[in-house]
A protein has these predicted regions:
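Binding-site signature for planar aromatic cofactors or substrates
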Residues: 1-131
Length: 131
């Protein structure tokens, strides 16, 4: 098991900040509103606006994210991604976005994250691997 039930609940109920990097190491961070865990090892993101992050993920399919209230929920998640522009995951994010906010633009892709590591960002424990 990688993520606990608490971690999954926090992800589903929060905005996240996703960090990516180019193959040359140039970083990019963006807020993500549509993010939810599918199980204790995978998280799904709806890509409606990503430009630089998407290009980074296509060239370097790794990312890290924290939830908006990292002081209260001090976890950093790291993983590998797959990008889907059609199929089951894409259909799932299109329906999810439509149900949640009918005025939101249709997602361009679904980004499936396989969580590989979880770290603490809590004062005193920052950088400690949790899972």
């Amino acid at each position: 098991m990688v993520m606990t039930d608490e971690m999954m609940e926090i992800i589903e109920s929060s905005r996240a900040y996703v960090a990516t990097a180019t193959t040359n190491g140039v970083p990019n961070v963006v807020p993500i509103g549509f993010i939810k865990p599918l199980d204790n090892k995978t998280v799904l993101i709806a890509d409606s606006y990503m430009v630089k992050s998407r290009a980074n993920l296509e060239a370097n399919p790794k990312l890290a994210f924290v939830v908006q209230d990292a002081a209260k929920y001090p976890y950093q998640f790291k993983g590998s991604v797959e990008i889907f522009e059609s199929g089951e995951y894409f259909d799932q994010v299109v329906e999810w976005v439509k149900e949640t906010n009918p005025l939101a633009p249709k997602p361009k892709a679904a980004i499936l994250i396989t969580i590989e590591e979880v770290y603490s960002v809590k004062v005193g424990d920052a950088g400690k691997k949790i899972a």
